[in-house]
């Protein structure tokens, strides 16, 4: 037989085998593959517990904790779970199940913070010893550990404690040390330690005048009634005060905020010297916000720094943040131009203050010098931290296609390239900044990449890759996901959509459509991340 004939037979014999393998590889998804908790649930690889110890990256595994040098990616064993548990057992201090919950808040000390069975334990991983132990009362919740001095603020039921000392003794209907105002306006906690831990600000919410609404606890063996205080439309709402507790004297004062008592007190922060408390007060109609400064010792109002109004609404979301290198200047965030941006404020001088109109239709007045640092048709997300050496604020920026991390110089206003410039600027990027601001852990995904984790040098933008996850649906038959925009009724505003077509989609057929819309605030459903933000079961 000729060589050509032999080749033809070999190719023909190989084709059915190849087609058979391909047919076997293409699988159909089931609910078990798509629903969290399913026996075959498909999820992307991840690295849990990544964080910084100063400028050294901590990378835990199930039984070993590694350090990663951010310049080279070199990994070194820091300690093991077995070693930690041996010391804990020797001191009858309990057992740590995994290393993923360990914190490393002290950049200048070889110490870690453990939380085990209602106790906070400071552990020296260099000398393998327990430095201190603090036990909380039973039913402790809303815990707030002060890194500066090791004190812990927490609540038991509706009252506030510091360590084992009760700070408040209020009856049912008055709640202390918990988040207030239904967690709106950036509120997600109820206690605020001063920078050195000498004072503790906290919320006190009187809702005794609010009617109770019955909810059913379905987790009990037999359903139980759980009454919550919830003001129905037009009915009396709760009243909030801000207290300041001094652990050294045991005394508490309250800010003299005056009337009306049903307004919102949001975005609490401290001055670096602990002498002043700053907060943004919002009226009940939510259309007039005022940045106020109070004396932390007397509770007296020291002055108004900024005011903003709008005929529709004003929505403060972020507390002011002082520059680490200048205690007289802070960063303020505002949506006054239609997009959330950063503003640099200076306390060293004052202004007479005049109302000025804003591009977004509102008005503002400044009683201290204020300079806009960022601008454009995009949003500032969270401030991630600072690089004091380069005088930079490092933050997350968000636009219609995704998010990324940037730096802006407070002196010049110059903004950096996106930190992921050397890898991909596409997708959703979430950053965790090192202590000095020199490095950043960048977790991100794109519509076709489930997850990648890099360490980024915030100056050179060079990266060290820690993880590139494989597609968990590789080998499965997948639907087609399309994204785009349609115009709102005004004919101008773009509304982003995500369209998922079935795997056997026939363009010549007419299909029923399930339209899912949740138009709530801060509920972005279409993203530039993995599968454009679609959940597996969508």
Positions of predicted regions on the chain:
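Hydrophobic alpha-helix feature that most strongly marks membrane-spanning transmembrane helices
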Residues: 282, 296, 310, 335, ...
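Bacterial Sec-dependent N-terminal signal peptides
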Residues: 1-27
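N-terminal hydrophobic or amphipathic segments with adjacent small-residue motifs
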Residues: 12, 17, 228, 235, ...
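Hydrophobic alpha-helical segments with strong N-terminal bias
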Residues: 9-12, 57, 469
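Beta-propeller folds
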Residues: 21-416, 438-439, 449
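Serine-hydrolase catalytic core recognition
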Residues: 34, 212, 274, 428-538
């Amino acid at each position: 037989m000729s060589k050509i004939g032999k080749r033809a037979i070999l190719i023909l014999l190989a084709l059915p085998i190849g087609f058979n393998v391909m047919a076997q590889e293409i699988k159909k998804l089931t609910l078990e593959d798509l629903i969290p908790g399913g026996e075959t649930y498909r999820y992307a690889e991840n690295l849990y517990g990544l964080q910084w110890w100063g400028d050294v990256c901590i990378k835990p595994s199930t039984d070993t904790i590694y350090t990663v040098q951010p310049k080279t990616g070199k990994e070194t064993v820091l300690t093991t779970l077995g070693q930690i548990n041996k010391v804990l057992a020797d001191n009858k201090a309990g057992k740590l199940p995994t290393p993923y919950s360990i914190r490393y808040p002290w950049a200048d000390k070889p110490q870690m913070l453990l939380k085990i069975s209602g106790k906070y334990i400071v552990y020296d991983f260099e000398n393998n010893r327990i430095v201190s132990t603090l036990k909380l009362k039973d039913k402790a919740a809303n815990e707030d550990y002060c890194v500066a001095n090791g004190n812990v603020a927490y609540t038991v039921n509706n009252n506030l404690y510091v360590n084992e000392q009760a700070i408040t003794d209020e009856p049912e209907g008055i709640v202390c040390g918990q988040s207030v105002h239904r967690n709106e306006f950036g509120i997600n906690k109820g206690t605020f330690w001063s920078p050195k831990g000498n004072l503790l600000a906290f919320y006190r919410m009187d809702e005794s005048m609010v009617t109770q609404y019955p909810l059913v606890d379905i987790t009990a063996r037999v359903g139980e009634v759980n009454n919550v205080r919830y003001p129905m439309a037009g009915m009396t709402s709760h009243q909030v005060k801000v207290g300041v507790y001094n652990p050294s004297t045991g005394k508490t004062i309250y800010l003299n905020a005056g009337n009306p008592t049903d307004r919102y007190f949001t975005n609490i922060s401290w001055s670096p010297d602990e002498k002043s408390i700053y907060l943004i007060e919002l009226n009940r109609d939510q259309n007039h916000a005022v940045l106020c400064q109070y004396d932390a010792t007397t509770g007296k109002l020291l002055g108004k720094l900024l005011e903003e109004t709008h005929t529709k609404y004003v929505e403060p979301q972020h507390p002011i943040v002082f520059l680490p290198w200048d205690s007289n200047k802070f960063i303020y965030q505002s949506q006054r131009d239609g997009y959330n941006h950063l503003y640099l404020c200076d306390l060293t001088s004052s202004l007479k203050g005049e109302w000025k109109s804003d591009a977004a239709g509102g008005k503002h007045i400044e009683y201290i010098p204020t300079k806009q640092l960022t601008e454009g048709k995009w949003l500032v997300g969270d401030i991630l931290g600072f690089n004091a050496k380069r005088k930079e604020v490092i933050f997350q920026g968000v636009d219609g296609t995704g998010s990324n991390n940037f730096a802006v110089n407070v002196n010049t206003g110059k903004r950096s390239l996106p930190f992921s410039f050397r890898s991909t600027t596409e997708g959703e990027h979430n950053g965790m900044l090192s202590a000095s601001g020199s490095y950043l852990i960048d977790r991100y995904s794109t519509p076709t990449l489930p997850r990648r984790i890099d360490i980024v040098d915030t100056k050179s933008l060079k990266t060290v890759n820690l993880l590139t996850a494989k597609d968990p649906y590789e080998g499965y038959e997948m639907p087609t996901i399309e994204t785009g925009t349609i115009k709102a009724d005004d004919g101008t505003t773009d509304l982003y959509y995500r369209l998922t077509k079935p795997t056997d989609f026939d363009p010549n057929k007419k299909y029923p459509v399930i339209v899912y819309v949740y138009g709530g605030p801060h509920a972005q459903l279409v993203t530039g991340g993995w599968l454009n933000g679609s959940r597996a079961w969508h």
